[in-house]
A protein has these predicted regions:
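Glycosyltransferase catalytic domains, chiefly GT-A lineage
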Residues: 1-332
Length: 332
């Protein structure tokens, strides 16, 4: 196995550019709440990315939403390369209190063509250009199994404004990323055991209870050798994040979305590989939690791991069909 290694010169260059961008967010782009609200005409709704096969998937996802009683309006974001789906957008979608939002109607053509956005990068752009102030984002192949109308009237959402769900894989974001965003990690303070940040640390790490019996050097060696990086104070929580569903207050987390956009624009060059180290699922999925963490904005990631659904085709031949994520408010 190999460790992610980003030399100090590159780290410093990335840190400097990152700092300039976050300074811009807190300066020129630090819009007031009324200014942010004026950018979005809608109130609350559901957003998904369509276009091509994703519009076909969105068709079944939207029917499922209505079957479960969800009445929130829906916006399907259509990327530039997939415009022209008139029957879906103009005839079918309005029957389900939905409409299409075209990139080309909102984003000027030259910046859009210059950016050369790929699939992963389209999602955060879609979240920003949707007209709603508060959104439930769902991937087109994501099916709600309960009514989502009350999602915005929950304690967890009101406390944080950003709800995320865990992925299958452990978080492997390297120290280099934390150096770039200017976030310090306390290598002498363990705050969780994977996703469990409620139980006393001594329950899963007896060393902590007896730490006074050891020298400072021995304590440091213990944390460096035996404690995962993302169990330490100052890091993003384990597990890694999944972006197939998110609940976002775009007014409160306006800068979070802009920084996530920054990570995605420079994702193929730097941040996708850096944040996920080439593991399965590398892409936009961890850029949202990374942006909130970098800006010290509140967020809640569901602690309960997802479950698999599927069947055994033959003995010892399990066919996975779906992932089942948990109710975020019950988890909170």
């Amino acid at each position: 196995s190999k460790c992610y290694n980003l030399n100090k010169t590159v780290q410093e260059s990335l840190r400097e550019v990152h700092s300039k961008f976050t300074d811009t967010l807190s300066g020129k782009l630090n819009f007031s709440i009324p200014q942010r609200e004026a950018l979005f005409s809608g109130s609350e709704g559901i957003v998904t990315i369509g276009g091509g096969k994703y519009s076909v998937l969105a068709y079944t996802m939207i029917k499922k939403l209505r079957d479960t009683g969800t009445t929130l309006p829906i916006e399907v974001i259509i990327p530039p390369q997939d415009e022209g789906e008139d029957d879906f957008c103009k005839n079918w979608l309005p029957k389900f209190n939905g409409k299409c939002i075209y990139f080309s109607d909102i984003v000027p053509s030259k910046p859009l063509s210059d950016l050369k956005l790929t699939h992963f990068q389209l999602k955060v752009f879609g979240l920003i250009i949707s007209s709603f102030k508060r959104i439930i984002f769902l991937d087109a192949d994501n099916y709600a199994v309960k009514n989502l109308d009350l999602a915005f009237n929950t304690t967890s959402f009101n406390d944080t404004g950003l709800i995320l769900w865990p992925d299958f894989w452990r978080r492997v974001t390297p120290p280099a990323f934390y150096n770039i965003i200017g976030s310090s990690i306390d290598i002498g303070k363990r705050v969780r055991f994977v996703s469990d940040d409620i139980s006393p640390v001594s329950r899963y790490d007896p060393f902590v209870s007896n730490s006074n019996d050891y020298t400072p050097k021995e304590r440091q060696e213990h944390f460096l050798k035996h404690v995962p990086l993302h169990d330490l104070d100052g890091t993003m929580p384990d597990l890694s994040s999944e972006s197939g569903q998110m609940v976002i207050d775009k007014i409160r987390h306006f800068n979070t979305l802009l920084l996530a956009l920054y990570y995605n624009v420079y994702g193929p060059t730097w941040y996708y590989k850096m944040i996920s180290q080439g593991t399965a699922g590398e892409g936009d999925k961890d850029t949202f939690v990374a942006a909130a963490h970098a800006l010290n904005m509140p967020y809640y990631q569901v602690r309960t791991k997802f479950e698999f659904d599927g069947f055994f085709y033959q003995k010892d031949d399990y066919k996975g069909l779906a992932l089942l994520q948990h109710d975020f408010e019950q988890d909170y």
